[in-house]
Amino acid sequence: QMREALLMQADAGMVGPLLVNPDGSEQRGCRRDIPTPWQIFCVALLFHKFMPDHPRFRNFNHTARPLPDENSIVQAISGACMLVTRNAMDKVGALDRKFFLHFEDLDWCRRFDAAGFKIVFAPHAVVEHTRGVCSRQRPIRVEYHKHKSLITFLRKHFTAYYPSSFMAAVYFVVAMRFFAVVLTKIFGLRKGRPAAWERLMTESTGSEP
């Protein structure tokens, strides 16, 4: 079905399936927008919680939106499962090694779009994905690389379009969130319960350790 989705869309370079959790629910991140510094800022400050339907403040994950009946063009899919064409990969290049962990898929999606290739979400191609299995042993290190990659992503793609003062504010918010996540992970692990900030980070980015 993913291969058919690529063949049906002449200018498609990448396709992703509907990722589901083991319980059958849709997994965040398999259809989403490319997060901008403004969106990161709004999600970090919970603006999307108070105004979820406002176009300037809503979350960039599409999980809360109804599933499309047919293949649809999206800004980004999840790196957990991607099918790309050889032609597109030859023109765009491989994944950027500057991203050690997380956000390499969003970077790739943005580069595919910049090269003129469409990104397709195929809702009828269903893949079960269990998140976080490979990195549960070192959760704080994972969070460090996740937040570091977020800053790398923002610097690479948006510094030319946003005032330096606003970008500095976004980096500060990301750094504060990292420290909050670390603290809640420490206390969450000690008390044996998930941390609220960890859930927020997952919700906002669509990424999981």
Where on the chain are the PLM-derived regions?
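Short, flexible, basic/aromatic active-site loop/helix in glycosyltransferases
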Residues: 34-75
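Short, hinge-like loop/turn segments at secondary-structure boundaries
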Residues: 30-36, 137-140
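Active-site-adjacent helix/loop segment of glycosyltransferases
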Residues: 110-191
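Membrane-interface aromatic/basic loop that binds lipid-linked glycans or pyrophosphate carriers
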Residues: 192-209
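Conserved donor NDP-sugar-binding/catalytic core segment of glycosyltransferases
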Residues: 1-31
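A short, conserved alpha-helix in the catalytic core of glycosyltransferases
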Residues: 1, 66-126
